[in-house]
Amino acid sequence: MDRRRMPLWALLLLWSPCTFSLPTGTTFERIPLKKMPSVREILEERGVDMTRLSAEWDVFTKRSSLTDLISPVVLTNYLNSQYYGEIGIGTPPQTFKVIFDTGSANLWVPSTKCSRLYLACGIHSLYESSDSSSYMENGDDFTIHYGSGRVKGFLSQDSVTVGGITVTQTFGEVTELPLIPFMLAQFDGVLGMGFPAQAVGGVTPVFDHILSQGVLKEKVFSVYYNRGPHLLGGEVVLGGSDPEHYQGDFHYVSLSKTDSWQITMKGVSVGSSTLLCEEGCEVVVDTGSSFISAPTSSLKLIMQALGAKEKRLHEYVVSCSQVPTLPDISFNLGGRAYTLSSTDYVLQYPNRRDKLCTVALHAMDIPPPTGPVWVLGATFIRKFYTEFDRHNNRIGFALAR
């Protein structure tokens, strides 16, 4: 296996925000997030036809495997991901930009042992085990399949620092990294914030290690995504929530499954008409996905009500001049309607010449027993500050400021 370092010139492409924490003695920690253009936005601006890429990458089933273990979970659509924070791995810490992903439970980053055949590795921060005094070898194979591609490597153990808290963690050193989307991605890896049952190979997730230390005020974490175009994209708070970023009280919805961030939705309305899910639909609240996703048949009903047209596979557009007149879309969660206006669920790309705007809802079809399931991603979380409560197995929503 090639153990040489990848070129350091690529590090010039990386951003380096400071990770900070609250003053000593407090019992929750903040991780600031940066907002960058998604891979999809970059490709759109360069005039790339997304039809083929959508067909290959908008596949919302992934098989996570360690040796012969395969477990289906909902796939985060990293092609559209925008929000990243920094963590440190090793002693002294090596810094990585990661997506905090409630749809998965493993931590992985690219390794210096990544083959030079995988060009995407050359533009990311790479973990070097020999530079860390706290590294411990594991060596078990690690593979995650994404549609037609895969992320592959092996497991290692080292110190991981998140928001000022350090734990000893087993994580994936990735040695095979697909060109798309990772060649253009602003993030290096993924930090799964899901449950132990979702983790590849029985690895204990990072947040569970943090909980075991007993340092947090509450067994919760919360996510805020800034709705503006600012580079300061939001924050993840471990152990609590930040009232500066939401108004009113949290409304909580109990998990429908105790091993994932999944709840039951009792209605989807467009304008004043309830079109779907009156008998109940399952929905995953996924911080790693940018869009709201629905089964194809359900999405078509919503798009018909909006008058949207399918431009390419699973992607719908409307005339930008039409946006102010589009109806609200509401999701009934725990007996309460959470409403998105057209400015919340329609994306406007200034550089597009066709004057079309993209509806931030995509099609997703997951077969039983995992599906069918909806996904509420950043399109929803930007409007509603979200708290993930492990102690009470529930998710809380409050209107974001």
Swiss-Prot record:
Subcellular location: Secreted
Any matching Pfam family: Asp
CDD domains assigned: renin_like (cd05487)
EC number: 3.4.23.15
Example GO BP: gene expression
Signal peptide stretch: 1-25
Chief site of localization: secreted
Disulfide cross-links: 114-121, 277-281, 320-357
A GO molecular function held by the record: endopeptidase activity
Reactions catalysed according to its record: Cleavage of Leu-|-Xaa bond in angiotensinogen to generate angiotensin I
Tissue expression per record: Submandibular gland.
A cellular component term, taken from the record's GO annotations: extracellular space
Active-site feature positions: 101, 286
Annotated propeptide span(s): 26-63
Residue ranges occupied by any Peptidase A1 domain in the UniProt entry: 83-398
SUPFAM superfamilies: Acid proteases
Keyword set, alphabetical order: Aspartyl protease, Cleavage on pair of basic residues, Disulfide bond, Hydrolase, Protease, Secreted, Signal, Zymogen
Binding partners and assembly: Dimer of a heavy chain and a light chain joined by a disulfide bond.
Additional observations: The active enzyme isolated from the submandibular gland has catalytic and antigenic activities similar to renal renin.
Physiological role: Renin is a highly specific endopeptidase, related to pepsin, whose only known function is to generate angiotensin I from angiotensinogen in the plasma, initiating a cascade of reactions that produce an elevation of blood pressure and increased sodium retention by the kidney.
Family the entry assigns: Belongs to the peptidase A1 family.
Name of the protein in question: Renin-2
Organism encoding this protein: Mus musculus
